[in-house]
Amino acid sequence: MGLQEDFEQYAEKAKTLPESTSNENKLILYGLYKQATVGDVNTARPGIFAQRDRAKWDAWKAVEGKSKEEAMSDYITKVKQLLEEAAAAAS
């Protein structure tokens, strides 16, 4: 399987992560996903009253400059790590 297919597979697996997944980890995944699918941030930073959107924008901005392939690879690695942690916590 190619990187794109693996990425799509792990994007689906990410949806099965437990509710207990930290917001920090969710934001990391969000930023990597956006970088992999869109590229560098292409919108203005949301205002101070839009805290959730601002946090998501900041997570995306944090990975600015990564190639789409690098972002896909990092995303896959992070999802694998979180799935392993969830499995270990469940046993």
Swiss-Prot record:
Gene3D superfamilies: 1.20.80.10
GO biological process: fatty acid metabolic process
Record keywords, A-Z: Cytoplasm, Lipid-binding
UniProt note on tissues of expression: Highly expressed in leaves. Expressed at low levels in roots and seeds.
Entry-linked Pfam families: ACBP
Domain of life per record: Eukaryota
Main location: cytoplasm
InterPro entries hit by this protein: Acyl-CoA-binding_prot_CS, Acyl-CoA-binding_protein, Acyl-CoA-binding_sf, FERM/acyl-CoA-bd_prot_sf
PANTHER family: ACYL-COA BINDING PROTEIN 1, ISOFORM A (PTHR23310:SF62), ACYL-COA-BINDING PROTEIN, ACBP (PTHR23310)
Protein name according to UniProt: Acyl-CoA-binding domain-containing protein 1
Lineage: Eukaryota, Viridiplantae, Streptophyta, Embryophyta, Tracheophyta
Gene: ACBP1
